[in-house]
C-alpha cells in the first residue's frame, strides 16, 4: 500500500464505567491526501443534548490536540484556530450522534481521533 498518498484514521470507543455512558465511534479509515473524512460518534447511557461533545486527536508520538466542540442541544460549535478552515462538527439529535468532518487531508493528519464528553 502506498502510504505517501493515504492517511489512516483510527477511532476508538470510550466507556464511562460509573454511568454506563458510551461513545462509540466509526471504524478506521484510509484516505488519500486532499480528500476528506467524516467520523461518527454515537452516544448512549446519558441525555445526548445535555453535554458538550469534544473532538480531539493524537498523532503518533504527539500529545492530545483539541479540535473543537459542539453543543448537541442547539448545534453551536467552537473550533481550534488551527482547524478552523478544515473541520466541521455536526450532530443528529434524533440519532444521538455527532460527526466530525476534516477536509483537505494532509499526511500530518494521520492520528487517532476521539470524541469525548
UniProtKB/Swiss-Prot annotation:
GO cellular component, one term: immunoglobulin complex
Entry annotated with the keyword Disulfide bond: yes
Region annotation Framework-1: where it falls in the sequence: 20-44
Residue ranges of the region described as Complementarity-determining-3: 116-117
Residues covered by region (Complementarity-determining-2): 70-77
Any one Gene Ontology BP term: immunoglobulin mediated immune response
Region annotation (Complementarity-determining-1) ranges: 45-52
Endpoints of the signal sequence: 1-19
Location within or outside the cell: Secreted; Cell membrane
Single GO term (MF): antigen binding
Domain Ig-like: 20-117
Keyword annotations: Adaptive immunity, Cell membrane, Disulfide bond, Immunity, Immunoglobulin, Immunoglobulin domain, Membrane, Secreted, Signal
Stretches assigned to coiled coil: none
Region annotation Framework-3: where it falls in the sequence: 78-115
Organism superkingdom: Eukaryota
Record-linked PANTHER family: IMMUNOGLOBULIN HEAVY CHAIN (PTHR23266)
Subunit text: Immunoglobulins are composed of two identical heavy chains and two identical light chains; disulfide-linked.
Role description: V region of the variable domain of immunoglobulin heavy chains that participates in the antigen recognition. Immunoglobulins, also known as antibodies, are membrane-bound or secreted glycoproteins produced by B lymphocytes. In the recognition phase of humoral immunity, the membrane-bound immunoglobulins serve as receptors which, upon binding of a specific antigen, trigger the clonal expansion and differentiation of B lymphocytes into immunoglobulins-secreting plasma cells.
The name this protein goes by in its record: Immunoglobulin heavy variable 1-45
Gene: IGHV1-45
